[in-house]
Amino acid sequence: MSSFLGKWKLSESHNFDAVMSKLGVSWATRQIGNTVTPTVTFTMDGDKMTMLTESTFKNLSCTFKFGEEFDEKTSDGRNVKSVVEKNSESKLTQTQVDPKNTTVIVREVDGDTMKTTVTVGDVTAIRNYKRLS
């Protein structure tokens, strides 16, 4: 998992507004979500990974073991059941389930770029991050 460890900054985002809309996120919150450029930091402590997301809008942190369900609060305030699977050393798949939607987030690292593909139903967004450290 060393390919994920460190700090990443959002560099480009495509179709994220449509994903937020599909999730029922309010117009005002979507406007904020479309303008912030979050930083995501991944750390490991034994068999637990922590993902810290920081932005001018909100800071969120979740700690998990691969393959084990955990409770997560999303940046738009939803409470979800989440599972992160380690597909390979450079690919993680996270599934978030709430009463209305299932969101699948695939994170893939290639060198100093992390491609994040977010899918809700038939709507997909791609958010690319650049490694800061």
Swiss-Prot record:
**Which Pfam families does the entry link to?**
Lipocalin
Function, please? May play a role in the transport of fatty acids. Binds various fatty acids, such as arachidonic, oleic, palmitic and linolenic acid (in vitro).
Its name, as the record gives it, is 14 kDa fatty acid-binding protein
Q: Is the keyword Nucleotide-binding assigned to this protein? A: no
Localization per record: Cytoplasm
- Binding positions for (9Z)-octadecenoate? 107, 127-129
Please describe the organ and tissue distribution of this protein's expression: Tubercles, muscle layers and body.
Gene Ontology CC terms = cytoplasm
